[in-house]
Amino acid sequence: MLLEIARWLSDDVRAIGVLEYITMRAVLACATALLIGLVAGPRVIRKLTEMKIGQAVRAYGPESHLVKTGTPTMGGALILIAVAISTLLWADWTNRFVWVVLLVTFGFGWIGWMDDYRKVVYRDPEGMPARQKFFWQATIGLVAAVYLAFAVSAPANTELWPLFKAWVSSGFAMPLPTRADLIVPFFKSVSYPLGVLGFVALTWAVIVGTSNAVNLTDGLDGLAIMPTVMVGSALGIFAYVVGRVDYSKYLLFPYIPGAAELMVLCAAIAGAGLAFLWFNAYPAQVFMGDVGALALGGALGTIAVIVRQEIVLFIMGGVFVVETLSVMMQVTWFKYTKRKYGQGRRIFRMAPLHHHFEVGGWKETQVVVRFWIISMMLVLIGLSTLKLR
């Protein structure tokens, strides 16, 4: 919004032209989201407490977590509000990628809100039935995936509907341009063409998978939000690179017209995340809830797809990946051994992985900070792919 005002006033106020620079607006978006979060945070926490929107702790979780019962939850709404206001203030409203990321973010946020509502109102720690939750995640992810298959492939300011009709007319066999290929990091010219159906399938898996992965990681005070901030910031750098003709050509990345504007949104996520961490650090005054975790995961996955860094997201979000794999391995092994031996056996003391270390004697703060350190190292490895090719 402010960019449009700046363009309108640019002839009279020359200095305001600085807002044409994406990097400047990214800094301002981060600062705005941070300020909104810090100012509104105490009021939101107080309101959640008055409304008795408290966390319902699972009975089979670590015993040390029982003291968290009643801590205000659904604080992820604060993050979403800060991100939305900051992005709408500083981003270019004509950019299609900004809107699709915002819509996916709030779509998954709505799913999380409904899930948290069931937990709070009905005092059901399990929340929304798994099948119902997955249905809505799959639906939103599929719609976004189909849209992005053509949005990423299209030249700047091109209508997408004619491209979709051309794909249907081709018998669903129309190839996508090379910039929509799956990029393999650390190699200069290695990429794999996906086609529309392959692109949609991969995009769907990345968006839905990342959303659930962040949600599974959000089990300790501050554990999920800091890796989200780091990964989101790194994706903002990738967005800036692939969204510029000069940088993308020099660093051998595909040029994605309009992607650079996502740096503003990524900066807003980082600022809002840091503000939330102020209140979510141990001992947490508020929890993110599914409304925040599902939304942020969906945002990261969508941005990674747009900037064509799905594999790099897998690297940088390694903490999210390992947490998810630990749950999958635990459940699969337990069911298999129960069928074979009549009694389920476990690989980990408890899943997700952060509980395994908690039960093993690590303090909650030790688990969190060590996972942060690992996440930082993985993000640096991901950023190194900008040059190590």
Curated annotation (Swiss-Prot):
It is a multi-pass membrane protein. It is an enzyme of class 2 (transferase). Pfam families: Glycos_transf_4. One of its GO terms (molecular function) is metal ion binding. Its main location: membrane. The chain crosses the membrane at residues 21-41, 71-91, 97-117, 134-154, 167-187, 190-210, 222-242, 259-279, 286-306, 311-331, 366-386. It catalyses: UDP-N-acetyl-alpha-D-muramoyl-L-alanyl-gamma-D-glutamyl-meso-2,6-diaminopimeloyl-D-alanyl-D-alanine + di-trans,octa-cis-undecaprenyl phosphate = di-trans,octa-cis-undecaprenyl diphospho-N-acetyl-alpha-D-muramoyl-L-alanyl-D-glutamyl-meso-2,6-diaminopimeloyl-D-alanyl-D-alanine + UMP. Catalyzes the initial step of the lipid cycle reactions in the biosynthesis of the cell wall peptidoglycan: transfers peptidoglycan precursor phospho-MurNAc-pentapeptide from UDP-MurNAc-pentapeptide onto the lipid carrier undecaprenyl phosphate, yielding undecaprenyl-pyrophosphoryl-MurNAc-pentapeptide, known as lipid I. This is Phospho-N-acetylmuramoyl-pentapeptide-transferase. It comes from Bordetella petrii (strain ATCC BAA-461 / DSM 12804 / CCUG 43448).
